[in-house]
């Protein structure tokens, strides 16, 4: 029984050592086999006189492509108005319902105090019953969960 396990482990190590070579050879053999099968099938079909026609695209696809490029190739019959000058206010900035816009307010320079301390108020205050700051006892750190 001992000799069987020794032979089994040496055979397994041989497969493990040559795995990539075996895999490459298997891929090549399968590819060549499938290629030969397809070659024989095509040759047999052509001997029988069967002609394969190349599939043509459907006509509605060509019409769609023509429609897609129609506006680019042909000038549109409707004459568009010229573009406004660049410094002209855009329609997005103001809508026609608004009253005439007032000139922007002018601001004066504010003298800043350089050594002034500012106090910041946090926007989020933790609730008192929040358990993030609770200390964990030392004897539970080593326990596995």
UniProtKB/Swiss-Prot annotation:
InterPro entries: Immune_Signaling-Apoptosis_Reg, SCIMP. It comes from Homo sapiens. The modification Phosphotyrosine is found at residues 69, 107, 131. Lipid tetraspanin-associated transmembrane adapter/mediator that acts as a scaffold for Src-family kinases and other signaling proteins in immune cells. It is involved in major histocompatibility complex class II (MHC-II) signaling transduction in B cells, where it is required in generating the calcium response and enhancing ERK activity upon MHC-II stimulation. In dendritic cells, it is involved in sustaining CLEC7A/DECTIN1 signaling after CLEC7A activation by fungal beta-glucans. GO terms for molecular function: molecular adaptor activity. Phosphorylated by the Src-family protein tyrosine kinases LYN and SRC. Phosphorylation occurs on tyrosine residues upon MHC-II stimulation. Phosphorylation also occurs on tyrosine residues after activation of CLEC7A/DECTIN1 by particulate beta-glucan. Lipopolysaccharide (LPS) induces phosphorylation of Tyr-69, Tyr-107 and Tyr-131 differentially to allow temporal recruitment of effector proteins GRB2, CSK and BLNK. Phosphorylation of Tyr-69 is immediately induced by LPS stimulation and allows GRB2 to bind. A lipid is attached at residues 40, 42 (S-palmitoyl cysteine). The chain crosses the membrane at residues 19-39. Residues 81-86 are annotated as: Proline-rich region necessary for constitutive interaction with LYN. This is SLP adapter and CSK-interacting membrane protein. Keywords: Cell membrane, Cell projection, Cytoplasmic vesicle, Lipoprotein, Membrane, Palmitate, Phosphoprotein, Transmembrane, Transmembrane helix. It comes from the Eukaryota. The modification Phosphoserine is found at residue 76. It is found in: Cell membrane; Cytoplasmic vesicle, Phagosome; Cell projection, Ruffle; Cell projection, Filopodium. Interacts with CD37, CD53 and CD81. Interacts (via proline-rich region) with LYN (via SH3 domain). Interacts with CSK (via SH2 domain); this interaction is dependent on phosphorylation of Tyr-107. Interacts with BLNK (via SH2 domain); this interaction is dependent on phosphorylation of Tyr-131. Interacts with GRB2 (via SH2 domain); this interaction may be dependent on phosphorylation of Tyr-69. Interacts with TLR4; this interaction occurs upon lipopolysaccharide activation of TLR4 and is enhanced by phosphorylation of Tyr-107 by LYN. Pfam families: SCIMP (PF15050). Residues 74-107 are annotated as: Disordered. The keyword Transport does not apply. Residues 104-145 are annotated as: Interaction with TLR4. One of its GO terms (cellular component) is leading edge membrane. It is a single-pass membrane protein; Lipid-anchor. Changing residue 131 to F: Inhibits interaction with BLNK. Inhibits activation of several downstream signaling pathways. One of its GO terms (biological process) is positive regulation of ERK1 and ERK2 cascade. Expressed in antigen-presenting cells, like peripheral blood leukocytes and monocyte-derived dendritic cells (MDDC) (at protein level). Highly expressed in lymph nodes and spleen. Expressed in antigen-presenting cells. Faintly expressed in the majority of nonimmune system tissues.
